[in-house]
Amino acid sequence: MDAAIRGNDVIFVLKTIGVPSACRQNEDPRFVEAFKCDELERYIENNPECTLFESLRDEEAYSIVRIFMDVDLDACLDEIDYLTAIQDFIIEVSNCVARFAFTECGAIHENVIKSMRSNFSLTKSTNRDKTSFHIIFLDTYTTMDTLIAMKRTLLELSRSSENPLTRSIDTAVYRRKTTLRVVGTRKNPNCDTIHVMQPPHDNIEDYLFTYVDMNNNSYYFSLQQRLEDLVPDKLWEPGFISFEDAIKRVSKIFINSIINFNDLDENNFTTVPLVIDYVTPCALCKKRSHKHPHQLSLENGAIRIYKTGNPHSCKVKIVPLDGNKLFNIAQRILDTNSVLLTERGDHIVWINNSWKFNSEEPLITKLILSIRHQLPKEYSSELLCPRKRKTVEANIRDMLVDSVETDTYPDKLPFKNGVLDLVDGMFYSGDDAKKYTCTVSTGFKFDDTKFVEDSPEMEELMNIINDIQPLTDENKKNRELYEKTLSSCLCGATKGCLTFFFGETATGKSTTKRLLKSAIGDLFVETGQTILTDVLDKGPNPFIANMHLKRSVFCSELPDFACSGSKKIRSDNIKKLTEPCVIGRPCFSNKINNRNHATIIIDTNYKPVFDRIDNALMRRIAVVRFRTHFSQPSGREAAENNDAYDKVKLLDEGLDGKIQNNRYRFAFLYLLVKWYRKYHVPIMKLYPTPEEIPDFAFYLKIGTLLVSSSVKHIPLMTDLSKKGYILYDNVVTLPLTTFQQKISKYFNSRLFGHDIESFINRHKKFANVSDEYLQYIFIEDISSP
């Protein structure tokens, strides 16, 4: 700092309130005078009834001042209350000033607090009916511009504080050409109350805010930008209502006419004082008139009407300009791509690092609150009102027109805290995961510290898996299908076949189910047998509706199909359950289309029986056999003599509890990912095993025996006629009786009689009432000479 401004001992004073600007500028000795401190003190002694008001001589040339405050409380505090209040007052205002100085001036927070709390002077009013004083912080210097900029901060402190002294700070003194009554002088000649000095400060310079005497203990700060630079080039923002409408609202508030109304425009309305024609009392405070004019300011998206001079002498009025503010808030939230509309008409919300449905709980409202602090200050305060939040939420819903396709990342596994790439093992979180729009997840957080191969849990898990599906040459094909099926549960795409887990009781099917449920969490759903045995239509079907976007569906405990009255598995249902879209809606909902990403596993102790068998069905069925029995010690001997089991193991009574406590969650998940990369990269492959279904034996074999007749077989008719074939309607046909004779050479009628009859009924045709035929040719009849 320049040495010229480190000191000022010439005190410029006004001799009365309301000195005309011209007299002040010309330094008319009738109204103004300049003193050295000792001269000022003698002048007051010689003129005890004088009225002196300290002010800066020329703010443009020199505006260094001490931080000062004027406190005026219309109540008298007793000594104890006063001491407590003044102590809290010093702490509050020093903290407030230090925060402002740090934020706006780049000052050192601790240094400001230290300089303010270590050295200050207090005056005391001789008026016994009130508590009034001036406080001068002797070693804390700033500029008048800085004090003016600090006015709002101190005003907010004054309004929010519970301290009566803090609430009584007069912020009106922070203005251009401000004045402060000199200690020991009167406010006017008729007023006999004055402010007196208090120990330990007995020098008049300690009570003057324009006196400057900087030393090593002093601290100075000022605005990093001038007030003029802080004013934006254009005050009126596009989101506001029109300026004309806003000024009309201001005019209606005053009731009395504004004489210079037509002089106001978008660029000057904050600097031009309002000239009011007080025909009637002030509409704000009901006083007959005001000496100082009202003025307008623009704050937080609203016009603020306040009175210059002492602002507490009239009410402050706010005129909101938020014609489209709530709409703008909704638009800003939409711009973050944190709320989307799915193709099913659902709203999904990006919150806490994952996409979630806005269904059971109001997640859009939670999102609005969570990003409130990321919005500009003028918007964030609006969201504290529940009614306005609801309006913003409604705006967001109305503005979302274009739907987005979700869950199109089959090789990504979503968690509560991010997304796991199944191919390369990368885990994406935060904004990196946001681009993978997945509406369902495992429901738990991914923990990379547990997602490792070498762990005690992995060792225990491998022993469990190897017991359920042994790694033997005889079981190699079965084990491979077991691994393929379970790892396909990670994939978010439609699977081409259903898998039956077939085996006697206590062979590890339910253990596998619980391990899978633990590993993929909410992506697993268990359903009933009705999805296999009942007609699937567009009616209410919560079992089908719950399959939407799930990656594994487990259907347990099929009935014993040998029992009378039990329903067979519907072939049509199997076909529908391998389609990308499954029809079925929840109760009280019209959403009937469910995206089918599930690996459907059917846990059964009985061989499956179908109502109808064809090639389409056989291409959609795979079977994993379970032949290791887990037995109690008492039943082990009987189990070892049962041909249904290859091995018998002792049952681990504590295993179920460990699985329920998710001990093997990340170990099994690691294993599933490993199998996924082994079998399903780059293409997911899940093949049927129709040869494992006894009921398919006839259809698998007959497909190797017969071909449909066609025109290319007509030239062979000479040889075929000798073998019982006839030509009917230009098609080679085989009479029914002849077909039955030929087919009996390949199939035992006692074992396959029902299948033969079913095949005939499905394919036979009628020449007339009594003659029946089939349009099939035995392969051996056209291949043999």
Swiss-Prot record:
<feature type="binding site">
    <location>
        <begin position="503"/>
        <end position="510"/>
    </location>
    <ligand>
        <name>ATP</name>
    </ligand>
</feature>
<dbReference type="GO" id="GO:0004386">
    <property type="term" value="F:helicase activity"/>
</dbReference>
<feature type="domain" description="SF3 helicase">
    <location>
        <begin position="477"/>
        <end position="639"/>
    </location>
</feature>
<keyword id="KW-0547">Nucleotide-binding</keyword>
<keyword id="KW-0347">Helicase</keyword>
<dbReference type="GO" id="GO:0003899">
    <property type="term" value="F:DNA-directed RNA polymerase activity"/>
</dbReference>
<dbReference type="Pfam" id="PF03288">
    <property type="entry name" value="Pox_D5"/>
</dbReference>
<feature type="region of interest" description="Primase">
    <location>
        <begin position="342"/>
        <end position="469"/>
    </location>
</feature>
<dbReference type="InterPro" id="IPR004968">
    <property type="entry name" value="DNA_primase/NTPase_C"/>
</dbReference>
<comment type="similarity">
    <text>Belongs to the orthopoxvirus OPG117 family.</text>
</comment>
<dbReference type="GO" id="GO:0030430">
    <property type="term" value="C:host cell cytoplasm"/>
</dbReference>
<dbReference type="GO" id="GO:0039693">
    <property type="term" value="P:viral DNA genome replication"/>
</dbReference>
<dbReference type="GO" id="GO:0005524">
    <property type="term" value="F:ATP binding"/>
</dbReference>
<dbReference type="Pfam" id="PF08706">
    <property type="entry name" value="D5_N"/>
</dbReference>
<protein>
    <recommendedName>
        <fullName>Uncoating factor OPG117</fullName>
        <ecNumber>3.6.4.-</ecNumber>
    </recommendedName>
</protein>
<keyword id="KW-1035">Host cytoplasm</keyword>
<dbReference type="InterPro" id="IPR014818">
    <property type="entry name" value="Phage/plasmid_primase_P4_C"/>
</dbReference>
<dbReference type="GO" id="GO:0017111">
    <property type="term" value="F:ribonucleoside triphosphate phosphatase activity"/>
</dbReference>
<dbReference type="GO" id="GO:0006269">
    <property type="term" value="P:DNA replication, synthesis of primer"/>
</dbReference>
<dbReference type="InterPro" id="IPR014015">
    <property type="entry name" value="Helicase_SF3_DNA-vir"/>
</dbReference>
<comment type="function">
    <text>Multifunctional protein required for genome uncoating and replication. Major viral uncoating protein that is required for the release of the viral genome from incoming viral cores containing the viral DNA genome. Possesses an ATPase activity that is required for hexamerization and uncoating.</text>
</comment>
<feature type="active site">
    <location>
        <position position="170"/>
    </location>
</feature>
<keyword id="KW-0378">Hydrolase</keyword>
<comment type="subunit">
    <text>Homomultimer; hexamer. Interacts with OPG148.</text>
</comment>
<keyword id="KW-0067">ATP-binding</keyword>
<dbReference type="InterPro" id="IPR051620">
    <property type="entry name" value="Viral_Helicase-Primase_Cplx"/>
</dbReference>
<dbReference type="InterPro" id="IPR027417">
    <property type="entry name" value="P-loop_NTPase"/>
</dbReference>
